[in-house]
Amino acid sequence: MVKERIDTGGKVFGPYSPGVKANGIIWLAGQIAPEAGGIREQTQASLDKIDALLAAAGVSKHEVTFAQVLLNDISDFTDMNEIYGAWLDGVEIPPARAAFEAAALPGGAAVEIVIQAYDDKCCA
């Protein structure tokens, strides 16, 4: 098995990889963007980071199989969901997803998004 670090050079806050790819499975660490503004802006900025990491792994949002969305305040769900849904526009099969409230997120973020994807070119 080959294990590969996925990185776009962004800042990390601890001993972890922004993403890891092994045997065609891609895991992205939770993406946050507390500097971006409100929930809508933070959601979009987090998804932009996810797009960049997926591209670094050689895939796109079309290969995302699971998303986990953590919200500092569950009342932000509707705004987050609108931005998230627009991001998925054109994706034939949307990923499975879980979304829930977390008491506190790193850096004072309002939203954190964790992604799992696959690379079907890997192991054919």
Locate each region found by the language model.
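N-terminal presequence-like segments and the immediate start of the first folded domain
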Residues: M1-T65, L71-A124
